[in-house]
Amino acid sequence: SISGGTDVVGCLVLGNIFSKVYAGEIQGESLGIDVDIFDENGKKVSKNKKGELVIKKPFPTMPIKFWNDPKNKKFKNAYFTKYKNIWHHGDFIQKTKNGGFIIYGRSDATLNPGGVRIGTAEIYRQVEKINFIRESLVVGQEKEGDVKILLFVVMNNKNKLSDSDIN
C-alpha cells in the first residue's frame, strides 16, 4: 500500500522491508519526507488520533510552482493556505501504535446538496461513532441539477442493518 500523488510524483507513505506488515496499515514514511499529522488548529496529534497529513519541510519531489501561475497564487492556495508554510496534502491519516499509517480518505472532499456545502469528513466523523459499522463510503450523486448524498456501509461481523439502527 502507498499514499502520495501525481502532484508529488511519488509516495509520502509506503511499505518498507524493515517494518512488520499489519492489516490495513501502510508501514512508514518515504525517505526525505517529513510527514506529520496535524489537527484543525495546526497542532501535532498523538498516535492513534486522526488528523491532516502534512509535510513540514521541503522534499525532493515537491513541486515549486504550477505552469501558467506566475505569482504562485494557485500553487499556494492548493497546498499552503491551511497551515502557514506547511504542505497540506488534503488526506485524513492516523499513525498507529505499530508505527504504521492508516489513510482515511480526502479531508477536502466537498459535496453541495441543495447549495449547502458539506465535507465528506463531517459525515465520516459521525459514522465512525456508530459501533456496528466497520467501514463506510460517502459519495455525491448528481441528479436533476442537485447532489444526492449516498452512504454505503459495511457492517461489523454478523450485524445486519435494521430500521431501528437507521432511526
Short names for language-model regions:
Residues 1-2, 6-100, 107-110:
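Conserved AMP-binding/adenylate-forming
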